């Protein structure tokens, strides 16, 4: 039986967090046996905001090494850097011609980023979702792991693919959102009503995958709980979001049920919960960081992974691009 094709990626801007790991990267690793997986470092998306060129190159290597340290296996998955597969931008341009201005102007992420980067509202930022559609449609992906912030972009991808298929006959697979069964949503440490984000300006909200263990413990000691007296360790997202976030985090790392954690911390102070959460996070990160350091030091191996991944991705992408070019009247 043919495995479903899945594609996902992360920008090499800002260090990947425990939220990225528990909410996405762990699922990427788990899917490698059941799916045909393509995982890319989306550096072309990163340049919609100004980047230091050398820092961006280093960040691409950092992100690639982190993928591998988390368990992404280049023998099982196609792992590549987006800009090393030129078919992404080639298809992106073609799809621009089948996307309406009104559709893009409704994208909430464009509105948010325009406010954040008011001095650099460029066409690339506006057309970002079309390149994302090309990323997905190039490989005929069936399933796309998406967070809440990317759902709207996936809907646009489906609309573009359907429009093209209606005009030229079956060309693109219509991708479905993939919602993992056991995906953990890690919230901000200081503001547990919002998701932990690697682009958060307040670094006390975030724990990076390469964070120093002492810094991890310090941040978790400062994590928001509540002012209940006496303290009550109970999972209640509506009334106790901070405590619930710490319980969810521990459960996601240790595999313990929320109920057993509630029983374990019954009658204890919030400091006990924070300390235990810190130890769980550090215990998860230390072996990952060790693998990362070894991989990041081996530039020849990273180059080999990039080269093999790009070759594989290009061969697959070219099949779709050729089909599209033929249908729209370009010489191939």
UniProtKB/Swiss-Prot annotation:
TM annotation in the entry: none
Domain of life: Bacteria
Keyword Endoplasmic reticulum carried by entry: no
UniProt entry tagged with the keyword Transit peptide: no
Sorted UniProt keywords: Aminoacyl-tRNA synthetase, ATP-binding, Cytoplasm, Ligase, Nucleotide-binding, Protein biosynthesis
Pfam family, one: tRNA-synt_1b
A Gene Ontology term for the protein's cellular component: cytosol
GO biological process terms held by the UniProt record: tryptophanyl-tRNA aminoacylation
EC number: 6.1.1.2
Subcellular location: Cytoplasm
Residues that coordinate or bind L-tryptophan: 135
Gene Ontology MF term list: ATP binding; tryptophan-tRNA ligase activity
Disulfide bonds: none
Primary subcellular site in the record, as a coarse category: cytoplasm
Reaction(s) the record says it catalyses: tRNA(Trp) + L-tryptophan + ATP = L-tryptophyl-tRNA(Trp) + AMP + diphosphate + H(+)
Residues that hold ATP according to the record: 11-13, 19-20, 147-149, 186, 195-199
Enzyme class of the recorded protein, top EC level: ligase
Locus of motif 'KMSKS' region: 195-199
Motif 'HIGH' region boundaries: 12-20
NCBIfam families on file: trpS
Subunit structure: Homodimer.
Recorded family membership: Belongs to the class-I aminoacyl-tRNA synthetase family.
Function as written in the Swiss-Prot or TrEMBL entry: Catalyzes the attachment of tryptophan to tRNA(Trp).
PANTHER family from the UniProt entry: TRYPTOPHAN--TRNA LIGASE, MITOCHONDRIAL
Protein name: Tryptophan--tRNA ligase
Species assigned in the record: Shewanella oneidensis (strain ATCC 700550 / JCM 31522 / CIP 106686 / LMG 19005 / NCIMB 14063 / MR-1)
Gene for this chain: trpS
């Amino acid at each position: 039986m043919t495995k479903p094709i899945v594609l996902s990626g992360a920008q090499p801007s800002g260090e990947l967090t425990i939220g990225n790991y528990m909410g996405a990267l762990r699922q990427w690793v788990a899917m490698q046996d059941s799916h045909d997986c393509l995982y890319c470092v989306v550096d072309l998306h990163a340049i919609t905001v100004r980047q230091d060129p050398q820092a961006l190159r280093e960040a691409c290597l950092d992100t690639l090494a982190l993928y591998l340290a988390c368990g992404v296996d280049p023998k099982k998955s196609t792992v590549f850097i987006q800009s090393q597969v030129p078919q992404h931008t080639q298809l992106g341009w073609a799809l621009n011609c089948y996307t309406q201005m009104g559709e893009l102007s409704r994208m909430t992420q464009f509105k948010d980023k325009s406010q954040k980067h008011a001095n650099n509202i460029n066409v690339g930022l506006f057309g970002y979702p079309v390149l994302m559609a090309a990323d997905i449609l190039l490989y005929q992906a069936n399933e796309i792991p998406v967070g809440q912030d990317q759902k709207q972009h996936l809907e646009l991808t489906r609309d573009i693919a359907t429009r093209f298929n209606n005009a030229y006959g079956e060309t693109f697979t219509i991708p479905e959102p993939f919602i993992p069964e056991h995906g953990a949503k890690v919230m901000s440490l200081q503001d547990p009503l919002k998701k932990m984000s690697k682009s958060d300006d307040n670094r006390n909200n975030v724990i990076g995958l390469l964070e120093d263990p002492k810094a991890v413990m310090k941040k978790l000691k400062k994590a928001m709980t509540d002012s209940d007296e006496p303290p009550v360790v109970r999972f209640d997202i509506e009334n106790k979001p901070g405590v619930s976030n710490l319980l969810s985090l521990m459960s996601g790392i240790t595999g313990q049920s929320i109920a057993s954690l509630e029983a374990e911390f019954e009658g204890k102070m919030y400091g006990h919960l924070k300390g235990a959460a810190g130890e769980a996070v550090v215990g998860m990160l230390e072996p990952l960081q060790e693998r990362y350091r070894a991989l990041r030091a081996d530039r020849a191996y990273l180059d080999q992974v990039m080269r093999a991944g790009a070759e594989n991705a290009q061969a697959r992408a070219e099949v779709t691009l050729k089909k599209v070019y033929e249908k729209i009247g370009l010489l191939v």
